[in-house]
Amino acid sequence: TLGDESFPRLILGDSYTDMTLENIAKGKPMGVYGMEEEGDMFIGITLNNIMVSFNVFVSGVLTSLMSVFLLFRNGIMVGCFDTFFYQHGILGESLLATMLHGTLELSAIIVAGAAGLAIGNGWLFPGTYSRLVSFQRGAKRGMKIVVGTVPIFIMAGFIEAFITRHTELNNFIRLGIILVSLAFVVYYFIYLPYKRNYHLENANRKTKD
């Protein structure tokens, strides 16, 4: 994007790019988040993100590479979006706004992609199991993971619809919400699974003893 100013149009589309340029000219670069009624926006965004996550997950059936490709494509879109605002000198404002909901949203999409990898790896690398049994185990494990992302998308959708639009909020408040969201992501996706597995391993050891 830095070397080709037409690249954002290729990735984000002409209409979105033109609308954003108009908002920047008006001094409201994040104006897109206030264009829709909060309730409708909450429902639409939440359902869309859940569908995206399930698409990334189910794509693992077509081998892990498809999940990786979809994650890569989404990464290009996010990178293009941020670089576009960097070119106009408002990257800081962009990050403070988008990461309010993006911290939860992007983390959940990545986790859904990992669930897709679990399906693909079960199909490609069955190990000592038959390919079908390995696939079923991977699908079951992956489904538990992706279902666990639904509450995260609901929270992210709420923040995007009701809070992100308020760019007049103090920057420290917005940064605080981002940091709390990040802490929750670490707790929900890293600490809780680790704690659960730790207790299961201890229980198994006691059973063997």
Per-region residue spans from a language model:
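Alpha-helical transmembrane segments
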Residues: 184-192
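Individual transmembrane alpha-helix segments
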Residues: 34-66
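Interfacial/capping segments of alpha-helical transmembrane domains
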Residues: 1-26, 72-73
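Short, highly charged, low-complexity non-transmembrane loops/tails of multi-pass membrane proteins
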Residues: 199-209
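Small-polar-interrupted transmembrane alpha-helices in polytopic inner-membrane proteins
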Residues: 60, 67-87
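Hydrophobic alpha-helical transmembrane segments and adjacent short intramembrane/lumenal linkers
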Residues: 82-168, 178-180
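Small-residue-rich transmembrane alpha-helices that serve as helix-helix interface/gating elements
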Residues: 171-185
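Short aromatic-rich membrane-water interface segments that cap or initiate transmembrane helices
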Residues: 21, 25-35, 39-44, 95-104
